[in-house]
């Protein structure tokens, strides 16, 4: 099993998705680092998690409508944790390419924003063709599986992973018309295309829903979707079928909702299972006992010690 440094790290004094956070865990010997790729208004590829800048930078507005110059003028994360810039994909690829092959962590590139697949593929293609990076250095993941197909049109040899476990905004809006007015308060990342219940416990989510939405069809539809998500209802044979069809190497799933039985089924299909994002001792040990192949964590050194990894 491997640990993947989620957005670099969340150590005190470090901001996620920054070159400094990547360098920190690289120096600690991490074997893989995950980061998020978006597309800005100028067609460049900033490394930012949230679609809206407000919670993850000193800026405001959508990443997709922001210029590269604006993104370069603001700080990533909280300046009190360090005055970090928002990096761009080329800078990250340069950082990894500068590391000796034997010590180079695998880049887990999550294609976060719409339209990221082709431009990311073109940039990665240059590094592959120049021999500065190789296919074993890169794993591309996304909740938007069309972006995985898109990057494969440029780099067909890249390994891909299907992300799942989140509530998909578009399908939920279609199933529960009118429910979208509650998304921002009901879900984590409620303004985005892929959302998570606020709490791992169904009862807490139902209590929150009751405080927001009157009983009726909308209430029932939202409650049903939360129940489906938390019960692992998204982890189906169809998901594994799609992973096989796309020749994916893994499915990356929300640890709160995955079962040991599904992990075993994925393994029977020849697929690895990676879980996001685990930081507590008990949950790390439970995931390891389940037999998963990798865990995304915000605290690499602490998680490594808990699991007794070399």
Where are these regions (language model features)?
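Phosphate-group recognition and catalysis centered on beta-loop-alpha active-site segments
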Residues: 1-310
């Amino acid at each position: 099993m491997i640990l993947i440094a989620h957005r670099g790290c969340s150590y005190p004094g470090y901001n996620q998705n920054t070159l400094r956070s990547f360098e920190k865990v690289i120096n600690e010997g991490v074997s893989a680092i995950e980061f998020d790729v978006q597309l800005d208004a100028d067609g460049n590829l900033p490394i930012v998690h949230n679609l809206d800048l407000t919670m993850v930078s000193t800026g405001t507005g959508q990443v997709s409508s922001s210029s590269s110059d604006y993104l370069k003028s603001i700080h990533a994360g909280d300046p009190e944790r360090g005055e970090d810039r928002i990096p761009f994909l080329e800078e990250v690829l340069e950082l990894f390419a500068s590391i000796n092959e034997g010590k180079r962590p695998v880049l887990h590139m999550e294609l976060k924003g719409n339209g990221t697949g082709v431009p990311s593929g073109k940039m990665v293609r240059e590094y592959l063709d120049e021999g500065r990076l190789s296919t074993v250095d890169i794993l591309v993941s996304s909740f938007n599986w069309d972006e995985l197909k898109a990057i494969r049109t440029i780099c067909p040899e890249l390994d891909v992973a299907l992300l799942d476990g989140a509530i998909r905004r578009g399908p939920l809006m279609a199933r529960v018309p009118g429910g979208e007015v509650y998304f921002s308060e009901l879900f984590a990342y409620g303004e985005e295309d892929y959302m998570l219940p606020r709490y791992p416990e169904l009862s807490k989510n139902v209590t929150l829903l009751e405080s927001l939405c009157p009983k009726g069809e909308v209430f029932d539809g939202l409650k049903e979707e939360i129940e489906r998500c938390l019960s692992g209802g998204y982890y189906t044979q169809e998901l594994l079928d799609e992973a096989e069809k796309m020749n994916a190497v893994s499915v990356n799933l929300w640890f709160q909702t995955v079962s040991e039985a599904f992990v075993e089924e994925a393994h029977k299909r020849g697929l690895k299972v990676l879980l996001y994002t685990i930081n507590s001792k008990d949950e790390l040990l439970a995931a390891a006992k389940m037999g998963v192949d990798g865990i995304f964590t915000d605290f690499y050194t602490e998680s490594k010690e808990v699991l007794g990894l070399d």
